[in-house]
Amino acid sequence: MLRTILGSKIHRATVTQADLDYVGSITIDADLVNAAGLIEGEKVAVVDITNGARIETYVITGDAGTGSICINGAAAHLINPGDLVIIMSYLQATDAEARAYQPNIVHVDADNRIVALGNDAGEPIPGSSLLSSRSL
């Protein structure tokens, strides 16, 4: 039996562009793609913190150092520039692999620059006002 678990997360990224006239997908700055361990074409879930929208799409790697997070295609009706999003990938693993796996967590600032890397999906950026989901 395989379990589906969190593979990686880019936490609280700011959407920089939304383009209806594109075939589909999400374009993500190459620095963030690499830090999260994502690959071109990989399926991701995008959760909009601002309005609650949730979509599934695939990754297009954008130019490094730009901070770009661009929602392409029909999803641009749901997610807008300036919205805060969480981008998550999932992987399938055996029970033993799943219990040992540590996801790649990428925390970013308002300009989508990496401010912290980690492996605990429930912990906020150290020093932020966000609450840990482990303290609930």
UniProtKB/Swiss-Prot annotation:
<keyword id="KW-0670">Pyruvate</keyword>
<keyword id="KW-0704">Schiff base</keyword>
<comment type="function">
    <text>Catalyzes the pyruvoyl-dependent decarboxylation of aspartate to produce beta-alanine.</text>
</comment>
<comment type="subunit">
    <text>Heterooctamer of four alpha and four beta subunits.</text>
</comment>
<dbReference type="GO" id="GO:0006523">
    <property type="term" value="P:alanine biosynthetic process"/>
</dbReference>
<keyword id="KW-0456">Lyase</keyword>
<keyword id="KW-0865">Zymogen</keyword>
<keyword id="KW-0963">Cytoplasm</keyword>
<keyword id="KW-0068">Autocatalytic cleavage</keyword>
<dbReference type="GO" id="GO:0004068">
    <property type="term" value="F:aspartate 1-decarboxylase activity"/>
</dbReference>
<keyword id="KW-0210">Decarboxylase</keyword>
<dbReference type="InterPro" id="IPR009010">
    <property type="entry name" value="Asp_de-COase-like_dom_sf"/>
</dbReference>
<feature type="binding site">
    <location>
        <begin position="73"/>
        <end position="75"/>
    </location>
    <ligand>
        <name>substrate</name>
    </ligand>
</feature>
<dbReference type="GO" id="GO:0005829">
    <property type="term" value="C:cytosol"/>
</dbReference>
<feature type="active site" description="Proton donor">
    <location>
        <position position="58"/>
    </location>
</feature>
<dbReference type="GO" id="GO:0015940">
    <property type="term" value="P:pantothenate biosynthetic process"/>
</dbReference>
<dbReference type="InterPro" id="IPR003190">
    <property type="entry name" value="Asp_decarbox"/>
</dbReference>
<dbReference type="Pfam" id="PF02261">
    <property type="entry name" value="Asp_decarbox"/>
</dbReference>
<feature type="binding site">
    <location>
        <position position="57"/>
    </location>
    <ligand>
        <name>substrate</name>
    </ligand>
</feature>
<feature type="modified residue" description="Pyruvic acid (Ser)">
    <location>
        <position position="25"/>
    </location>
</feature>
<keyword id="KW-0566">Pantothenate biosynthesis</keyword>
<feature type="active site" description="Schiff-base intermediate with substrate; via pyruvic acid">
    <location>
        <position position="25"/>
    </location>
</feature>
<comment type="pathway">
    <text>Cofactor biosynthesis; (R)-pantothenate biosynthesis; beta-alanine from L-aspartate: step 1/1.</text>
</comment>
<comment type="similarity">
    <text>Belongs to the PanD family.</text>
</comment>
<protein>
    <recommendedName>
        <fullName>Aspartate 1-decarboxylase</fullName>
        <ecNumber>4.1.1.11</ecNumber>
    </recommendedName>
</protein>
